[in-house]
Amino acid sequence: GFNPCGETCQIDQTCHAPGCTCSIANICVRN
């Protein structure tokens, strides 16, 4: 399935998908 949080966030520490947050591993996950 499609993961709306599939982006990484090591560059600017932000996730552009709604309802997603940057994890410690610099991967966007659902919050």
Swiss-Prot record:
There is a cross-link at G1-N31 (Cyclopeptide (Gly-Asn)). This is a cyclic peptide. The keyword Disulfide bond applies. One of its GO terms (biological process) is defense response. Pfam families: Cyclotide. Disulfide bonds join C5-C20, C9-C22, C15-C28. The keyword Cell membrane does not apply. Keywords: Disulfide bond, Knottin, Plant defense. Probably participates in a plant defense mechanism. The presence of a 'disulfide through disulfide knot' structurally defines this protein as a knottin. Belongs to the cyclotide family. This is Cyclotide psybry C. It comes from Psychotria brachyceras. The lineage of its organism: Eukaryota, Viridiplantae, Streptophyta, Embryophyta, Tracheophyta.
